[in-house]
Amino acid sequence: MSVQIQWLRLSMLAALFTTALVFSCRGEQSIPKLNYEAVPDFFQLPAGEHFVEVAGVAVNSKGHIYVFHRGKHPLMEFDASGKFVRSIADDLFVAAHTVRVDSEDNIWTTDVGAHVVLKMSPDGRVLLSLGRMRIPGDDVGHFNQPTDVAFDREGDIYVADGEGNSRVLKFNKFGNPVLGWGMKGSGPGQFDLPHSIAIDGDLVYVGDRENARIQIFDLNGRYLREWKLGHPFGLFITSDHFIYMSDAIAGRILKINQEGKAVGVLDGPPPDKGRHFDPHSLAVDKDNSLFTAEVLPWRAQKFRLK
């Protein structure tokens, strides 16, 4: 039996806004620098291969890194030392955006050209497809350039349907729609390009990129509060509950605590042959090494603690 989608009404969100806490990042010059250094030439590509518009990066439980880019082998796997392992499902992708890994090491991708979200097993078999391949739309069976995907403890799936639709859709673990929220705008619960999404416990963090804020909701889409910390391109939450936010406009990565305070900043390395720091998305491994995906420089990088 189909599940009726329950859209949260804007009037409810507006009422919540009067009591919500809004955080601003002030005195940015006092943010401590994160003590990282770039690892030169970490990713060892096969002869003749190169990255193109690197949009996504993720790390699995073995320390293997997935790089999602817009070249002829869009999804590439590397081992913990940076050695190339394989490319996965070359013919499935149109325009790479985000790659994520869930608690069972399944691989999830969002594709802004194909308008789909895919779940693949660790060996690369497609287990679930959300949306309709190459068919955009604004109902619950379609996406319009989905930007990111996240999962809660129950296995429910949350999709930021951001480039074409300003909304979040929630599905159960079988891919059946449960609820959705959001519309174009700048008010609480509204979005102007929800570009990233991450979940920590019972909280859903949405990177509302063009409104230059992170909005925080409960698992049912109820607006709680927001933080204004720049333009959130990518979000990643570590096991110790720090939120890492990449901002490709400012060319930096922020480390944010649970109160919404920026407690560290990585401004990136000096420009390499004119290529500026452009962190579109990011991931952090168990050793707190940082990995970045950069669209304009066609680059993926690893940063290690000094």
Language-model features and meaning:
Residues I5-Q6, L16, N288:
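Generic extreme N-terminus detector
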Residues S11-V22:
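Bacterial N-terminal signal peptides
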